A protein has these predicted regions:
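N-terminal secretory signal peptides that target proteins for export/translocation
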Residues: 1-7
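Intrinsic disorder/low-complexity segments
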Residues: 8-10, 29
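Bacterial N-terminal signal peptides
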Residues: 10-20
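Active-site bordering "gate/hinge" segments
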Residues: 27-375, 380, 389-390, 492, ...
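Long, low-charge, small-residue-enriched segments that form tightly packed helices used
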Residues: 140, 360, 378-565
């Protein structure tokens, strides 16, 4: 074997050992993470002040902290909004927020209760070491005093309560060190603003469009985290979001709204100017169709088919929210505070469906995922978690606050921006079927079920609005399979029980729904078919139509906007 081959073999063994020992990827890739940390003024100030707090933070008659953490969020963002063909807002902003958590007691019982959950502060942007450390010092002192008061209040309350199966207040975690590159926001806003202006001119194409607005938000978010256990983490991620929304009114006064968004990890994943305008035109056309659509029938109980896009909303609301392992309030005996609290090792979905949450994935079948991260906001490495296996609930997503039967974190403790406490959160929630059907087979199954029950039509839902209210819903006629758009529908019984008992098939297709919100995450789901759901007419108030028409728009202006650009 040559010297070069020997060297390569040694390198291979070293990398293998680092990974098998759970060594942080950031550390394995960096020759000297400490040098990188010292070169970062924010991280250096956090580490220096943390060491000072560990040795000097002690009040008379109050125990010293057993745990301290500092978390800083640096958010550089640009936002813009256009309406009626003109830019209405154009703002570049940047802020740094600090959150300090000081825990008194021990891992079994500590002060993390009400005001003891942490102290917040605004951090300076100029990287002055003394200014940074001063804000850290102020927040740490305040957090320590609040922790002392909270521990007393908590112990007093516990004397009046009985908990059958108490669990620890905090989970231990191995220290990690990972220094990733900082994210930066560097772009020319002018072409993006022109895209917003062009899309918002679509109000001219339809006098009955009350408004058509477009907006964007680009963010570069850098996270810093250190704790007294030895964890030092810096990560950076950029997010890019573009939206448009149109509003109109049906002849009977019903308010109609449609929106569409594009969310990406990189600017290159956003649509081109032509694609963005084309999507906006499609949405405006859908609003015109919705105005002419008839109202949904007052009563229907039967099969309903949901597109992959619509099913992402169902699984986000009925599964995603309920697999989060939030610890119950003090004195409560439940496993969690959500609907699946008593469903551990019980069936929550049909046996052909399984669900995982895998924040380590960057893509799913070549589609980018927004919920990827390496280390969560509590300093724990992200892990893939099998949440539902063959319909059976097997896990909850948890952070470092244990719940019954789950004493340690599985890397899902994340914090809302800018400075909320960390808690269980989704990463990339992925639903799969062991018995997938083609789109044609799913529609045929819908029609067959309707025929068996002498129903003239079934329903197909393509998208949702808020609170699981369908926004695009179609009658699928048994006679010839054609689809007819209707409006004004709500579901009477779309809940966790119907998800468990009435969901009978899933497709081989899928949709990826990327959500930015305050905690970026992704939902991946197939189309799904329920054998029976109640669909009824919404009892919503209707506003009167405008008393007189909008200002006239010249035919030439309409033609200019309608022409492909």
């Amino acid at each position: 074997m040559t010297e070069k081959l020997r060297a390569l073999a040694k390198l291979f063994v070293l990398v293998f050992l680092l990974r098998s020992l759970g060594m942080p990827r950031g550390l394995a890739q960096s020759k000297d993470w400490q040098a990188s940390a010292q070169a970062d003024p924010v991280l250096q100030a956090m580490r220096v002040e943390l060491e000072r707090s560990k040795t000097q933070l002690k009040l008379e008659a109050v125990a010293a902290p057993y745990y301290i953490e500092y978390r800083v969020i640096d958010d550089d963002e640009y936002s813009a909004q256009a309406a009626f063909g003109a830019l209405g807002a154009d703002l570049r902003s940047r802020f740094r927020f600090l959150r300090v958590v000081v825990r008194i007691g021990d891992y079994k019982q500590d002060s993390y209760f009400h005001q003891g959950e942490g102290s917040s502060n605004i951090m300076p942007l100029d990287d002055d070491p003394l200014a940074l450390r001063h804000q850290l010092w102020i927040a740490t002192d305040r957090a320590y005093k609040s922790a002392a008061e909270s521990l007393t209040a908590k112990q007093s309350q516990l004397k009046q309560l009985t908990v059958d199966q108490p669990v620890d207040d905090f989970a231990r975690a191995e220290p990690l060190q990972s220094i990733e590159p900082l994210a930066k926001l560097d772009f020319d806003p002018r072409p993006w603003n022109r895209m917003l202006e062009d899309a918002s001119t679509l109000y001219k194409t339809d006098p009955q469009l009350e408004s058509f607005e477009s907006s964007l938000k680009f963010q570069a978010i850098n996270r810093y985290f250190v704790n007294s256990e030895g964890t030092v983490v810096r990560s950076g991620q950029s997010y890019y979001e573009m939206n448009f929304v149109g509003r109109s009114q049906a002849a009977d006064g019903m308010s109609l709204e449609r929106d569409k968004g594009f969310v990406a990890n990189t600017m290159t994943e956003l649509p081109s100017a032509e694609a963005f305008l084309s999507a906006a035109k499609d949405l405006a056309g859908t609003l015109r169709t919705m105005r002419d659509a008839s109202l949904v029938d007052e009563e229907y109980r039967g099969p309903v088919l949901f597109s992959p896009n619509a099913s992402t909303t169902i699984f986000a609301d009925l599964v995603g929210e309920n697999v989060l392992g939030y610890k119950p309030e003090l004195g409560k005996n439940g496993r969690t505070s959500k609907a699946f609290a008593s469903s551990y090792k019980s069936r929550v979905l049909p046996d052909f469906l399984s669900v995982i949450d895998d924040p380590t994935l960057a893509t799913y079948r070549d589609r980018p995922l927004l919920g990827k991260y390496e280390i969560d906001d509590e300093g724990v490495r992200a892990r893939s978690v099998s949440v539902v296996e063959n319909g059976m609930l097997t896990n909850y997503l948890i952070g470092r606050q244990p719940i019954r039967d789950f004493p340690t974190s599985n890397g899902h403790g994340r914090a809302r921006i800018p400075n909320n406490p960390a808690g269980p959160s989704l990463g990339n929630l992925i639903v799969t079927s062991s018995e997938p059907l083609s789109a044609e087979a799913m529609k045929k199954k819908l029609i067959d079920l309707c025929q068996q029950r002498d129903l003239p039509y079934g329903y197909f839902v393509d998208s949702f609005g808020s609170k699981l209210a369908p926004r695009l819903i179609y009658k699928v006629w048994v006679k010839d399979g054609h689809q007819e758009l209707v409006r004004g529908a709500i579901f009477g019984d779309l809940d966790t029980r119907s998800l468990r008992n009435n969901l009978i098939a899933a497709g081989d297709d899928f949709s990826v729904k990327n959500h930015l919100l305050n905690i970026p995450h992704s939902i991946v789901t197939p189309s799904i078919l329920f054998d029976e759901l109640e669909v009824k007419r919404a009892n919503q108030s209707k506003e009167k139509l405008p008393e007189y028409p909008p200002p006239l728009v010249s035919k030439s202006a309409i033609q200019q906007v309608s022409a492909a650009k």
